Amino acid sequence: MKKLIGGVSHHEREIEELREDREYAIATLQLAMDSLENPEERGGGLLALRAVAEAYGGLGAVAAQAGISRESLYRALSPKGNPTLKTLVAVLKTLGLRLSVTEKREANAA
């Protein structure tokens, strides 16, 4: 990633904020998981999951703890990735989180 002279890249700052604020990281993951059901938003959701993984140990360490090759995790959490349920569960478990099911709320429901 290109370094900014006298500054910090947006990506580096995002990783720092995710690392410093666990509630923010969890909220980011909740939005990311919601976006996975929409094909137009899926890539952004996967990148958000990737950013949280980077913030909590880096992709290499998360992959090792999750029992996944680093290359597979990079592919799965890329904008065109298609992670398996096994991969999602393993990554979330490594981050100290788990999947949860809630009732879908329609945007136009009263």
Protein language model features and the residues they cover:
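Long, contiguous binding/interaction regions
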Residues: 107-110
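DNA major-groove recognition helix of helix-turn-helix/homeodomain DNA-binding modules
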Residues: 85-102
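Major-groove DNA-recognition helix of helix-turn-helix-type DNA-binding domains
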Residues: 80
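N-terminal flexible/basic segments that precede or flank functional cores
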Residues: 1-48
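Amphipathic alpha-helical interface surfaces
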Residues: 25, 45-49, 58, 69, ...
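Short alpha-helical DNA-recognition segment
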Residues: 51, 55-74
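Short, residue-level hotspots on alpha-helical faces of the histone-fold
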Residues: 31, 51, 90-94
